[in-house]
């Protein structure tokens, strides 16, 4: 009996030793993981906040939502995660009951505000793409501020009930932080999930679904050969002649546009999948865990799964600055410029100021619906004519964060016709990465810009005006015989002589015609 008992004690001691070693190994792994998460959340969101704060021309209406998102994530890394790191070391909460309640409130408040902000960003992209003409009236500065205030108020309403008796706050030994006791009040668990998580997720699905539908519609139009090109030419008389032609699917231009639209469709799909996929991967496991706790009790989920699901929700704060900030080439270039100086500042300051209002951090989605003239009018600036690369369908490729820009005039005219609109004309879309690359691309692929048309029209007008002045001076000084025969024939109207009143009216009419060319046609050419 003594031998058997000693062997049993040895087995128990060995099991306890193995359990302690396993617990110590898992504790070190958890500590390293939460430290890495905290550092990445803090640094990633901090660089975006600093970039937007110091480069205020990037802080457009759309980017105000992104600024609020990254700022809230940074507050999470400063006010919540350090205490989680400490609790993972001590395996207990040592900061008192008051701070336990406050940290739980902060975690729920910041997490709820982040998810709701993602939904608002999706709504902003929806209006920018599907209703570009109404976008400046729908999304204004005052409304953006009101929406941000509502987001935080909405989140606060969803987070306060545990402090007033509906559920409670407790320290979870497997999450290593103070959270709401999801297993005590299933009703509050369902309320918080619907109020703060499910609602923005459904909004994202609907808005990005419509956006991708628009991309598919535009791609189908190109592949089916329904691309209409409007070419405008100037005749010798100064009048414009418009001819409309439909490009065939077998032509090089249509084939190229089909490839570009197909690439745009793929990139739009990738962007949407990344945004929605990041939300589902980071928050999905946590929602499953708290739902299981509310339905089947606290011990229905393994401690390891509970810990990693909670900490996986923290990684959503890492994904946000990557998706909405560092993924964009312009933001990366601004960040590198601040870190390493002018080596990465290839754009002059004036040019950055011109293009700043046309830029959005999340423009992989936004720029799908904004034409250059509309965006420039929103910014209160002139459209950029020398930095556009347009196709005959109004489509252009943006170098900003790999965005492909698609105008939606065709989609609007098909599904949502606007009353009193003008006939469709050739539209252009302004894109930019930096002026150096645009100039190089323009040198490789010559494009007939608006300025070239203006200069050509001005030269033609100046030549015609000089000839008319010379001819009229010769008539006044030397008479009609001084004019060449060809010019005399051109000036003579059948049945009307130069000496009659009708002939003088003809000269006056030509002067008015020249004045009309100067004041009307040139202005129209500049506007075109």
UniProtKB/Swiss-Prot annotation:
One biological process term in Gene Ontology: negative regulation of smoothened signaling pathway involved in dorsal/ventral neural tube patterning
PROSITE patterns listed in its UniProt record: G_PROTEIN_RECEP_F1_1, G_PROTEIN_RECEP_F1_2
Membrane topology label: Multi-pass membrane protein
Gene from which the chain derives: GPR161
Name this protein carries in UniProt: G protein-coupled receptor 161
Family assignment from sequence similarity: Belongs to the G-protein coupled receptor 1 family.
Record's GO cellular component terms: ciliary membrane; cilium; recycling endosome
Membrane-spanning parts: 31-51, 65-85, 102-122, 144-164, 191-211, 270-290, 307-327
One Pfam family recorded for the sequence: 7tm_1
Species whose genome carries this gene: Bos taurus
Keyword Transmembrane helix listed: yes
Broad class of the protein's primary localization: membrane
Molecular functions per Gene Ontology: G protein-coupled receptor activity
